[in-house]
Regions:
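Short, well-ordered loop/turn and helix-capping segments at boundaries between secondary-structure elements
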Residues: 22, 104, 114, 118, ...
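Flexible loop/turn segments at secondary-structure boundaries
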Residues: 81-85, 108-110, 115-119, 168-169, ...
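Long, low-complexity, intrinsically disordered segments
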Residues: 211, 216-233
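Acidic, proline-/serine-/threonine-rich low-complexity intrinsically disordered repeat tracts
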Residues: 197-219
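Acidic, carboxylate-rich catalytic segments that either coordinate divalent cations
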Residues: 151, 164, 174-199
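Conserved phosphate/anionic-ligand binding catalytic regions in large, soluble enzymes, centered on
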Residues: 104-114, 154-172
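Conserved, well-ordered active-site substructure
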Residues: 88-97, 169-187
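Metal-assisted phosphate- and nucleotidyl-transfer catalytic regions
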Residues: 1-108, 127-154, 193-203
Length: 233
C-alpha cells in the first residue's frame, strides 16, 4: 500500500543511487570518464548518452532507482547536465536546485529554481543544441530571445509542474494514461480520406464559383453611450 501521509521522504539523487546500486558518484564528482565506467559497472546502458558525470548519474537513477520509489519520495539535487533551465546549487556547482516527486515508481512532478543568469543559460543552451544535433530529441534548442530577456533581468523565481493525469492513474488504479487523460490524442478513423481531400482541395477551390461579398447596411444603427439610464449626459 502507498502511504501519502506527510511528510514525504527527501533524498538526493546521488544518495538514492548509492542506496540502491552501491555506486558512489559523489566520490568521483566531475570525472566524466570514471562516472561512465561506474554506471556501466552496475549494468546501466550508456549507449547514445553523453559522456558526462551528470548524465551518467541520471541514467543510473533512471534505469536502476526510479522504479523502486514506491512510497512518496522527493528526489533532490539534479545534475546540471539534465537540468538546462534550473539554477545551480550554491552548495555544489555540479548540481541544481531541482527536485522531482515520485510515487509508485512514477514521476508526479518536476520543480526547480529558475536559472536567471544569461551567461550560464547561453552556455547550457549551446550544450543542449549539441546534444540535439547528436540525436537527442529531448534536448532543448538555442533560444536567443530568452537569453536576451534574461540580460534585461529576471527576479528570483521558481515553479512546479504537477502531473495531474499520472496522479489520477494512481488514484484510479489504471495502467494506461489513456484511461484517465481528458483529451487523448487519437488517430482519425478517416485519416486516409482526409489526406485525399486535402490533395484535391486546391483543384476544387479553383473551380468553385466566386464569392460575392455581402455589404452590411449601417445607416439605421444608433450609437448610444453606456449606462445612459444611470448617468445624466
Amino acid at each position: 500500500d502507498v502511504d501519502l501521509t506527510p511528510s514525504w521522504k527527501r533524498i538526493t539523487m546521488a544518495d538514492a543511487v548509492q542506496n540502491v546500486t552501491g555506486a558512489d558518484f559523489m566520490a568521483i564528482e566531475g570525472d566524466d570518464d570514471a562516472a561512465v565506467e561506474l554506471a556501466k559497472s552496475v549494468g546501466v546502458d550508456m549507449e547514445g548518452v553523453a559522456r558526462k558525470w551528470g548524465n551518467a548519474l541520471y541514467e543510473t537513477f533512471d534505469q536502476k532507482v526510479e522504479e523502486t520509489l514506491i512510497q512518496p519520495t522527493f528526489i533532490t539535487m539534479y545534475p546540471v547536465e539534465v537540468s538546462p533551465l534550473a539554477k545551480r546549487s550554491p552548495e555544489d556547482p555540479h548540481l541544481t536546485e531541482r527536485y522531482e516527486m515520485f510515487v509508485c515508481g512514477c514521476e508526479m512532478g518536476n520543480a526547480f529554481s529558475e536559472l536567471n543568469d544569461p551567461i550560464d543559460q547561453h552556455q547550457r543552451f549551446k550544450a543542449q543544441a549539441e546534444k540535439r544535433a547528436n540525436g537527442d530529441e529531448e534536448a532543448d534548442m538555442m533560444d536567443e530571445d530568452f537569453v536576451l530577456a534574461l540580460e534585461y533581468g529576471m527576479p528570483p523565481t521558481g515553479g512546479l509542474g504537477f502531473g495531474i493525469d499520472r496522479c489520477a492513474m494512481m488514484l484510479c488504479g489504471t495502467d494506461s494514461i489513456r484511461d484517465v487523460i481528458l483529451f487523448p490524442t487519437m488517430k482519425p478513423l478517416d485519416s486516409d480520406k482526409k489526406v485525399s481531400k486535402e490533395v484535391s482541395a486546391p483543384a476544387e477551390a479553383a473551380q468553385a464559383a466566386p464569392v460575392v461579398e455581402e455589404k452590411i447596411d449601417f445607416s439605421n444603427v444608433q450609437i448610444e453611450p453606456l449606462f445612459q439610464n444611470q448617468v445624466d449626459f
